[in-house]
């Protein structure tokens, strides 16, 4: 059975663990770099990307997560996870640099502009996915290596590149585990 870690420093950690288990994998909380050993994949949950980056640096997780990805291990970033995984963040903040695109933090506005929307996602059997956007980012300037999986109003809100999958929204806050199944079956 596949073993997936969830970076447990902020965000909907328990919801991601439930989603991983509902998709048929084992889930583990990751708080330290040695927690990455033996994992097949890692989820970087939503939260506040600047705070998450600071905590990752304090606990010496930035370089181990980069090394994890460079070993070919899969990473799924949601919301703030998308921001952290992007090659660049508008405004010049440090990132993991693993997805060749630029992230626009809070691209859809602040907390009061949070919303739900139906997305068309060609990689799923069902026609739409109900997505929850909370202070959501989006991507711009993806390289040719990046495959866009979903957009809303022309803004990229889901993408993949090699062993990296990102969503600007929070699939873990729904009862629909298709994004996690996609991660386990197609990205891992």
Curated annotation (Swiss-Prot):
<feature type="active site" description="Charge relay system">
    <location>
        <position position="172"/>
    </location>
</feature>
<dbReference type="InterPro" id="IPR029062">
    <property type="entry name" value="Class_I_gatase-like"/>
</dbReference>
<feature type="active site" description="Charge relay system">
    <location>
        <position position="170"/>
    </location>
</feature>
<dbReference type="GO" id="GO:1903600">
    <property type="term" value="C:glutaminase complex"/>
</dbReference>
<dbReference type="GO" id="GO:0036381">
    <property type="term" value="F:pyridoxal 5'-phosphate synthase (glutamine hydrolysing) activity"/>
</dbReference>
<protein>
    <recommendedName>
        <fullName>Pyridoxal 5'-phosphate synthase subunit PdxT</fullName>
        <ecNumber>4.3.3.6</ecNumber>
        <ecNumber>3.5.1.2</ecNumber>
    </recommendedName>
</protein>
<comment type="pathway">
    <text>Cofactor biosynthesis; pyridoxal 5'-phosphate biosynthesis.</text>
</comment>
<dbReference type="InterPro" id="IPR002161">
    <property type="entry name" value="PdxT/SNO"/>
</dbReference>
<dbReference type="InterPro" id="IPR021196">
    <property type="entry name" value="PdxT/SNO_CS"/>
</dbReference>
<comment type="similarity">
    <text>Belongs to the glutaminase PdxT/SNO family.</text>
</comment>
<dbReference type="GO" id="GO:0004359">
    <property type="term" value="F:glutaminase activity"/>
</dbReference>
<dbReference type="GO" id="GO:0005829">
    <property type="term" value="C:cytosol"/>
</dbReference>
<dbReference type="GO" id="GO:0008614">
    <property type="term" value="P:pyridoxine metabolic process"/>
</dbReference>
<keyword id="KW-0456">Lyase</keyword>
<keyword id="KW-0315">Glutamine amidotransferase</keyword>
<keyword id="KW-0663">Pyridoxal phosphate</keyword>
<feature type="binding site">
    <location>
        <position position="105"/>
    </location>
    <ligand>
        <name>L-glutamine</name>
    </ligand>
</feature>
<dbReference type="Pfam" id="PF01174">
    <property type="entry name" value="SNO"/>
</dbReference>
<keyword id="KW-0378">Hydrolase</keyword>
<comment type="function">
    <text>Catalyzes the hydrolysis of glutamine to glutamate and ammonia as part of the biosynthesis of pyridoxal 5'-phosphate. The resulting ammonia molecule is channeled to the active site of PdxS.</text>
</comment>
<feature type="binding site">
    <location>
        <begin position="134"/>
        <end position="135"/>
    </location>
    <ligand>
        <name>L-glutamine</name>
    </ligand>
</feature>
<dbReference type="GO" id="GO:0042823">
    <property type="term" value="P:pyridoxal phosphate biosynthetic process"/>
</dbReference>
<feature type="active site" description="Nucleophile">
    <location>
        <position position="79"/>
    </location>
</feature>
<dbReference type="GO" id="GO:0006543">
    <property type="term" value="P:glutamine catabolic process"/>
</dbReference>
<feature type="binding site">
    <location>
        <begin position="47"/>
        <end position="49"/>
    </location>
    <ligand>
        <name>L-glutamine</name>
    </ligand>
</feature>
<comment type="subunit">
    <text>In the presence of PdxS, forms a dodecamer of heterodimers. Only shows activity in the heterodimer.</text>
</comment>
